[in-house]
Amino acid sequence: MTPKKKEAVDSLHYETQHGQAINCDSLEYMKSLPDSSIDLVITSPPYALHFKKEYGNVEKHEYVDWFIPFAKEIKRILKDSGSFVLNIGGSYEKGTPTRSIYQFKLLVALVEQVGFHLAQEGFWYNPAKMPMPAEWVTVRRIRIKDSVEYVWWFRIIIR
């Protein structure tokens, strides 16, 4: 079935018999949704990168505080039987060949502050991913290309 485009006030909106895809400010949109009304939220938010992207991204030290409002809204709109799946990539510490742990700090905050349960973790293997940071991977060759990202599956109630 070909998705049909549906006009929306401030977003691109596609709908099929299987669900909807909405392109908008997700935090504002979630605020308009009723409690316990969604079965599944899948997201891959902007990563904490060293260089600014046109679509916007925050620094590693701000990342958890930036994402928590989204997580609280996701928890509010999820049904008790619902799932939240988060894809998040890693990052290096600026100027050093060492990895940041910002995504693990987020994982702990999602469980301890927001109240999600980590149901399962998975890994997305992306061999086409760019070799970043270039200084450590392609120039000095002291780190291998990072071709894996985390995919975390959260639940509110574990069954």
Regions found by a protein language model. Give the residues of each.
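Core catalytic lobe of class I
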Residues: 2-159
